[in-house]
Amino acid sequence: MRVVRAGIIGLGEVAQIIHLPILESLNTRFQVTAICDISPMLLAAMGERYRIPASARHTDFRDLVARDDVDVVFVLNSTEYHAECAIAACNAGKHVLIEKPIALTIEDASLIASARDKAGVQVMVGYMRRFAPAFVEAVDEVRNLDRIRYVRVRDIIGHNRLIIEQSSNVLYPDDIPQEAVADRQARNREMTDTAIGEDSGATLRRA
């Protein structure tokens, strides 16, 4: 079986808790060959932890998607950047896994789909419960049943922050470049204006 080479964009909480550990546990099937984040601290820490050479640690996602040793790109950064990164990956001929939600607008989601179709690659939104062991086992059990007359699903939505703090050792960066902070703020203001109208008043936009 050929090992799939993965490039990771975004090294925050979901990458540290879910994606990087799982990819490492599946090391006969996947290899993380490159990582990208705007935080030098996270790049250094995750690079050391997962044995990624310095030459494969990037602060610009365009450098990562252009690499020949990346087959699939994991888009795990903040949602307002999903479309830009995913489209660039598709245009570079890479398959893409995007953390949920796929994008903030239907327009951006459609642009991702168009880039996927044009490039002939696969794009998947990472709703992981479909592949969770409990779900897979439940599907197998249901197949063995005769006629199903009643179905009830119970889900416990807990306090995730408490669980994360007690069970994980997540690194949170304190070295995000100021221009990146300003860019994200500008994008969020633009999204708010799009949602409620630019003439709604400054106080309402800030809310």
Which residues does each PLM region occupy?
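A contiguous active-site-proximal alpha/beta segment in oxidoreductase catalytic domains
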Residues: 103-176
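Structural motif corresponding to alpha-helix initiation and N-cap regions
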Residues: 17, 40, 58-61, 83, ...
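Beta-loop-alpha module in the N-terminal Rossmann-like domain of NAD(P)-dependent dehydrogenases
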Residues: 50-114
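N-terminal Rossmann-like dinucleotide-binding module
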Residues: 1-52
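Rossmann-like dinucleotide-binding domain that binds NAD(P)(H)
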Residues: 173-207
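Short active-site oxyanion
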Residues: 30-34, 54, 71-73, 123
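Acidic-histidine catalytic/liganding microenvironments
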Residues: 26-27, 50, 67-68, 132, ...
